[in-house]
Structures are given as structure tokens and as C-alpha cells.
A protein has these predicted regions:
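N-terminal subdomain of nucleotide-sugar transferases
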Residues: 1-67, 392
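Donor nucleotide-sugar binding/catalytic pocket of nucleotide-sugar-dependent glycosyltransferases
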Residues: 158-191, 209
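A conserved catalytic-core segment of Leloir-type glycosyltransferases
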Residues: 46-110
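Acidic donor-binding loop of glycosyltransferase active sites
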Residues: 268-282, 295
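A charged, aromatic-enriched C-terminal amphipathic alpha-helix characteristic of glycosyltransferases
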Residues: 329, 333, 337, 346-380
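Conserved catalytic-core segment of nucleotide-activated headgroup transferases in glycan assembly
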Residues: 188-190, 195-251, 257
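Short hydrophobic beta-strand element within catalytic cores of glycosyltransferases
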Residues: 296-299, 306
Length: 392
């Protein structure tokens, strides 16, 4: 039986620094490697890299522009995956949405895929997804975020993938949704540093929902008591302004900020990774990637983070009042478990070696690429029948 998969997502393909986009691109490559005829129809919506234009991004991917379209349409390949994209504006607009939706519907009719892969719940994709199902395709929606608590988001979906038991339970409790839990697709060669020289305590993406407030409290105390511990913050242009607005960060003598780049470069200079997320994180990709590099991640006890690290990370509490909307710093006492753990692992070589070994071991058990690739392929070739998407 000929199997084919079309990823339809009103987002930029494999956007740098965007875990969801990178995961979906990896998943497509896995399916292509298993014999699926794989293609993607994407757009110009960039979510995590405000300094990157879609033209620059598509040029880096080696895509070619077609003449005569109302907006630029580009085509090319990502290895075995055929790519076509509309260079819409980086934010949704009616004209771009309509053009993208029409092109997606054309692709469905032309390619007649056996499977549609999608994420983001974009309304302009509704007609294309409905047409695919009418032609017998199976629509698989992957949930990367926590906001999809309306059954209407899944109106044209046959099966749903979530990335943690936490997220599966949350959606089941909110809207009665049945889903299959699988980790996001992650390529080890794309994230594992070749020649690591770990020197930094690293914090990635200093946004409110990622924990900039508890991070600032830790940085302030480290500046007073342990200024010898260098801190690296990985931040895009828009996030740098948020950092500059926090007086607590001005005192640290060894706090460096760098833009998002190849994750292997970041993990290659990271000794400990901070993930003090106050929000209910659906998974925690950076924590998993850190463990692949033998870097102990220090993660909050919120959402799917404890699940993502298993026995390979250190799960630490945040004060109950602390949410992503908090506008005051937690006290030293409230953040002491974090501070004490950082200092212990920084100073005690034996303790660090034990934690690093646990990270390596857990990542191999949880995220071995060969096993995850096979599990993904098995999921897509399963002919069913499948349980109802929603509980009665």
C-alpha cells in the first residue's frame, strides 16, 4: 500500500528556536525515511524568531520562488521531504490566510495523501482538512500547547497526539479528548554537542511563562553570593528588552546574553540548565535536549516537566503564588532549593558527575531516537479501528 503524508500547518517550516516547528519537521523526515511520500505546505508565520524574515528563512532552506503568484510561493526539499510554502506576513492576515488555505486545499486534491499531519488549529485549514477526510485521509493533530480546550479545534481531526501524560489528562478533563502520548520527535545529531566545554548556568527564552521572574531572583542572589558562576541567557531581540527592564539582573558581573543559535553551540557551553517555568508546561523540550547532552536540568514541578526529565533531572518547587503573571520576585527563602542545588552541583564534582550520568541514562531510556522513530512510524501505519476522539 502506498502511504503518503502531507503536513499542513499555517506556520514557518522548521523555524529556528521553535520546538514545535522543529519537532514536526523531524517527524516528517522520520516518516519519509520509513517509505512515506512526505510533503509539507507551510506559510510565513514566524513565532519565536522576531529578527528573522520569512524570505531569509526560506533562502536558508534553499527554497525557490515561483513567478506569477499573488504572494511569493516557494518550493524545494528538506532531504526527502517536498516543501511548498506561501510567503505570507509573519502575523495572520485575511489575505494571507485565504491564500494559504486555498493552496493547502489544492495540495490535498493534487497529492491525495493517506495522512494529514497538522498543528496550530488554524481556521483557514478547515476546508483542506475536510477535503482530505472526504478523500479517505486520516488527519492527525499534534498538540504542542495548552490552549486547545475547545472541541471545535478538533472538528476535522481523526487522532490526536500529546507529548506528556499531564497534557493528555488535562485535555481529557477539560473537553473529554482521547489522545495518544508520545514525546516530540527529536533528532539527536541536531542537538548533541560534539566537543562540549561546559562553563555556564544557562536559561533559554526569558519570557514570563518560561520563568523570567524566578530566574531574576536567582540571578540577583548569585550576583551577591556567587558572582563566580557565569550565567548565559539565550534571548531573541524582543526578549533582550524584557531582560534590560529587570534591575535585578544588572548586578551580576558575569551575565551574558546571546541570540538563539544552533542548539549544539548552546548546549556545548552549558553546565546546568535552568527551567523555572511557572506555567503548566505541556512538555519541556529544552530539558530533554539538555539531558541528551548529559546536562542536568533543574526544572519546576509544574505541568509536564517532571515527566519530561524523569530520573534524569532535578525537580524543584516554586512558591504556589508564583504564576506567569507575577510582577514581584520570590524571596531568597522561597528560591533556596534552587540556589542550594546550583551551588552544590557547581562545587561538588562528584555530585555533578552523578547528576550528569543520570541525565545521560534517562535520556537514552526516554528518548532513544531509534525507538522513538519506530514508535512514530507504527502509530501512522496502524490501520485502526481507533477509539472515539471524545468521551460520550
Amino acid at each position: 500500500m502506498r502511504r503518503s503524508v502531507l503536513m499542513a500547518a499555517h506556520r514557518a517550516y522548521a523555524e529556528p528556536g521553535n520546538g514545535a516547528a522543529l519537532s514536526m519537521a523531524t517527524l516528517l523526515r522520520w516518516l519519509a525515511g520509513a517509505g512515506f511520500d512526505a510533503a509539507a505546505i507551510t506559510s510565513g508565520l514566524i513565532e519565536q524568531a522576531p529578527d528573522l524574515t520569512i524570505v531569509q528563512h526560506h533562502d536558508r532552506l534553499g527554497l525557490r520562488r515561483q513567478a506569477g503568484a499573488a504572494r511569493a510561493v516557494v518550493t524545494g526539499h528538506d532531504g526527502p521531504v517536498a516543501l511548498i510554502a506561501v510567503e505570507t506576513d509573519r502575523r495572520p492576515d485575511p489575505v494571507g490566510d485565504a491564500q494559504y488555505g486555498a493552496l493547502a486545499a489544492e495540495m490535498v486534491t493534487a497529492r491525495r495523501p493517506t495522512h494529514i499531519l497538522t498543528y496550530g488549529a488554524d481556521p483557514c485549514l478547515g476546508p483542506a482538512l475536510a477535503a482530505a477526510r472526504a478523500l479517505g485521509a486520516q488527519v492527525v493533530t499534534v498538540v504542542h500547547a495548552a490552549g486547545y480546550t475547545n472541541r471545535a479545534y478538533f472538528q476535522q481531526t481523526d487522532r490526536v497526539v500529546t507529548h506528556s501524560g499531564f497534557m493528555a489528562r488535562f485535555l481529557a478533563s477539560q473537553i473529554g479528548l482521547h489522545s495518544t502520548t508520545m514525546p516530540p520527535a527529536m533528532s539527536w545529531p541536531a542537538v548533541v554537542a560534539r566537543d562540549p566545554d561546559p562553563v555556564f548556568l544557562t536559561f533559554i527564552n526569558p519570557a514570563a511563562h518560561k520563568g523570567i521572574v524566578p530566574f531574576a531572583a536567582l540571578a540577583q542572589r548569585l550576583a551577591r553570593e556567587r558572582p563566580d558562576i557565569p550565567i548565559l541567557v539565550v534571548a531573541s531581540g524582543g526578549r533582550v528588552a524584557a531582560l534590560a527592564a529587570l534591575p535585578a539582573l544588572a548586578d551580576h558581573p558575569a551575565l551574558l546574553v546571546c541570540p538563539p543559535r544552533d542548539p549544539r553551540e548552546i548546549y556545548g557551553i552549558t553546565k546546568l540548565l535552568l527551567v523555572p517555568t511557572p506555567a503548566a508546561e505541556p512538555f519541556g523540550r529544552v530539558a530533554a535536549e539538555a539531558m541528551m547532552n548529559g546536562i542536568p536540568p533543574l526544572v519546576s514541578d509544574r505541568g509536564g516537566l517532571p515527566e519530561a526529565v524523569g530520573a534524569g533531572g532535578i525537580v524543584l518547587p516554586l512558591p504556589e503564588w508564583l504564576t506567569h503573571a507575577a510582577d514581584r520576585l520570590p524571596t531568597d527563602a522561597e528560591m533556596s532549593p534552587w540556589f542550594d542545588t546550583i551551588v552544590r552541583l557547581w562545587d561538588d564534582d562528584a555530585a555533578y558527575a552523578t547528576a550528569s550520568g543520570a541525565a545521560h541514562q534517562a535520556s537514552a531510556a526516554l528518548y532513544d531516537e531509534t525507538r522513538q522513530r519506530q514508535r512514530t512510524v507504527d502509530y501512522f501505519i496502524d490501520p485502526g479501528p481507533f477509539p472515539p476522539l471524545f468521551a460520550p
